[in-house]
């Protein structure tokens, strides 16, 4: 589902998205979108995922969420039936005992701390699971709700394929906002003037085109238990006459206009596997990477679904490397002559080679389609040997760098590091990713997050890892950083770790390498899912 918007306003600490004439505003609440009208008595609508069950017609997940809300003292949040248990009710379970709807506003991310609920949703009893229900694509002024939420393990960065039967994307007309949300939106439209229709001066609610896949969203009308009451002076709390869902006639809200689009390809779908991992095919994909992803026009023979996937890949490239390739990542020492898009393809190849989440199969399909569309007199066997050597060196150095920083983090957790009188400044990116590496390292060596650790010790670990990340990201070889750490610690352990990781390669899976891939996946998807997409047009790198 896609919702175009014209402008945004920050009000009471929450971002609101206005349509073109400012007659209606959207805001995010617990992974769902709520639409409110300017006009007194206008329709309020809610768009989002409801939880269902583990199979067709099953409502076990919805029943479990309702029972947990009752058990934890949040009876006020329990819906009247199993058909309307929205994702924001799931968010309430992990939001603390005193949480209300107001506390869920502003994010599409929904935390799932209950392993039983996680087992229902992704068939694994994991903790620290995050469901990402949508995204704000600021470049396009669009809010997007995914067909099925993306499930991410925030501890290690792994992505899971959710049970599709557990979710359904629906639209519901609301008769009132919850009390906390009424206070949030009170006075919202006062500071935003309405833009009247230039042709007839009408101030009727503007039609909003909501774009959905061919499997359109269900239409659910809330069944209100309360008796009819007179309209009050508060525009978002009025009880309107009771409406019942009729099997033979359901209508959309006055402001909604549904448009269908072809199904959007999930480029990270693990069921879509690459046909080959030979170096020659990888070199071809790297050679044509910029043309395949950044070429503005659709070439002959390119399927619509693959064409749509190019935009998704582009946003992932921007998230990892920046709009102009300004964000550093691993493999820079040997890959500095490659574009960010080419380095992205190499990362996807490595993840695919080791059977982690990746989109290399889609890139392979795009490359094959592009090469087939080239004129017959073009020489497609034009990948130079120098480029092949660069690709191999970049892939190997990338995995070795990730492996070294991961094993270093695991080792530092057990070493008594000398305290420093002060810390040198490190980049914000290195600090954030250093924390992610250490969190995964603790999991890898069996240390629980619940074990108390002195704050100064944690800061010391984070400083060393973030400082070393800055060194790697600048293109400095692993060896130099390992030697510096040997001097600091008065120990040869760092250089021994270096020689242990330097022998591995990215093209032949081996046991220790699987741990390295866990770090690579955590850092890569940490950027893809947490870095906002920048504004602007596609820029050649």
From Swiss-Prot:
It is found in: Virion tegument; Host cytoplasm; Host nucleus. Keywords: Host cytoplasm, Host nucleus, Virion, Virion tegument. The keyword Membrane does not apply. Pfam families: Herpes_UL21. Its main location: virion. InterPro entries: Herpes_UL21. GO terms for cellular component: host cell cytoplasm; host cell nucleus; viral tegument. May participate in DNA packaging/capsid maturation events. Promotes efficient incorporation of tegument proteins UL46, UL49, and US3 homologs into virions. May also play a role in capsid transport to the trans-Golgi network (TGN). Interacts (via C-terminus) with UL16. Belongs to the alphaherpesvirinae UL21 protein family. This is Tegument protein UL21 homolog. It comes from Varicella-zoster virus (strain Oka vaccine).
